[in-house]
C-alpha cells in the first residue's frame, strides 16, 4: 500500500460528501414575512432550548460577579476616603 492509496480514500470520501450537500435558500415562514400580519420586529423567547437557558445562567453569573466587584470597589473607596481624614 502506498501513501497515495491510504490518503486518497478519505479525501475522496470527503469530496464525495461535500459535492452531495445541497444548499437551499428556503427559510421557514418566508412566504408570511411580507404579509401585513407579520410582526418581524417581535421575537418570541423560548426557554425550552439549551442555548436560552445557558445565556440566562451566563447573564446571572455576570451580574453577580459585576455586583461583587462593585461592592468591593465601593467599599475600598469608602474605606480609603474615611481613613484619609485621620
UniProtKB/Swiss-Prot annotation:
Topological domain spans for side Intravirion? 69-86
Range of residues in the leader sequence: 1-29
Query: What keywords is this UniProt entry annotated with?
Result: Disulfide bond, Host Golgi apparatus, Host membrane, Membrane, Signal, Transmembrane, Transmembrane helix, Viral envelope protein, Virion
GO cellular component terms, semicolon-separated? host cell Golgi apparatus; host cell membrane; membrane; viral envelope; virion membrane
The listed locations are:
Virion membrane; Host membrane; Host Golgi apparatus, Host trans-Golgi network
Mapped to this chain, the residue ranges on the Virion surface side of the membrane are 30-47
Family that this chain belongs to: Belongs to the herpesviridae glycoprotein N family.
Name of the protein in question: Envelope glycoprotein N
Q: Which organism is it from?
A: Human herpesvirus 7 (strain JI) (HHV-7)
Q: Gene encoding this chain?
A: gN
Amino acid at each position: 500500500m502506498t501513501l497515495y492509496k491510504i490518503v486518497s480514500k478519505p479525501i475522496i470520501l470527503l469530496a464525495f460528501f461535500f459535492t452531495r450537500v445541497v444548499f437551499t435558500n428556503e427559510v421557514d415562514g418566508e412566504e408570511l414575512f411580507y404579509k401585513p400580519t407579520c410582526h418581524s420586529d417581535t421575537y418570541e423567547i423560548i426557554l425550552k432550548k439549551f442555548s436560552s437557558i445557558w445565556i440566562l445562567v451566563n447573564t446571572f453569573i455576570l451580574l453577580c460577579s459585576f455586583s461583587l466587584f462593585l461592592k468591593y470597589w465601593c467599599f475600598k473607596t469608602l474605606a480609603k476616603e474615611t481613613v484619609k481624614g485621620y
